[in-house]
């Protein structure tokens, strides 16, 4: 076990896109899994959630599992930092992962989903100052 303070741990998710044969490999180190909108049936899946390991620097012997998934035309994947799902409003409520899932499930292309999420977070927090950085990456197979 590391002697680092809890706030010093780092989580991450790595998504490697393999254009041929249209697959992604996901490795998760204690991070929120990608929110993936499957275009074939409009379902939300979160690959890498079961395979998530500990944040880095907690256990120097930690071995991380990868998961490989096929990405179909029209599929959209949302990756985000905890500053997005943990964004707080004036009532001390978190934006939450459920909102991210719901807003992604509403569909659209990568730009539409990006715009929807950014607008929703900005509206939710209103004039409450952010306590953490926020990053959002939305990718789509065309």
Task: List the predicted regions and their residue ranges.
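Conserved subregion of the PPM/PP2C metallophosphatase catalytic domain
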Residues: 1-142
